[in-house]
From Swiss-Prot:
Matching CDD domains: Chemokine_CXC
GO molecular function terms noted in the UniProt entry: chemokine activity; CXCR3 chemokine receptor binding
Positions with biased composition (Basic residues): 93-126
Purpose of the protein: May be a cytokine that affects the growth, movement, or activation state of cells that participate in immune and inflammatory response.
Disulfide bonds: 30-57, 32-73
Annotated Gene Ontology cellular component terms: external side of plasma membrane; extracellular space
InterPro entries in UniProt: Chemokine_b/g/d, Chemokine_CXC, Chemokine_CXC_CS, Chemokine_IL8-like_dom, CXC_Chemokine_domain, Interleukin_8-like_sf
Gene: Cxcl9
Protein's UniProt name: C-X-C motif chemokine 9
Amino acid sequence: MKSAVLFLLGIIFLEQCGVRGTLVIRNARCSCISTSRGTIHYKSLKDLKQFAPSPNCNKTEIIATLKNGDQTCLDPDSANVKKLMKEWEKKISQKKKQKRGKKHQKNMKNRKPKTPQSRRRSRKTT
């Protein structure tokens, strides 16, 4: 009985607070109307995002954001774009490795040096 009352009070409380579940959708339609087959060097990229097909858009979309802020839709079937995606993924994985390496170096600096067992033991003087 107590658990049912507490459950109902919890539901009423959440309702009063305005907690609602909402569906988050990227867009109600495809973001890319047309695509570019032109070549973009991966060093000029700021970001590269790939969106899988969804109920609202039945095609794979790749959106490149350049360092100057321009956004371009790329053709996912193009050989140049596939190569660009591989280079971008390689660049991102290298950045993650560097970040992990810096974190490891920082942890190593914060550690106290270990002393040998012989130094820890108290020596008897005779």
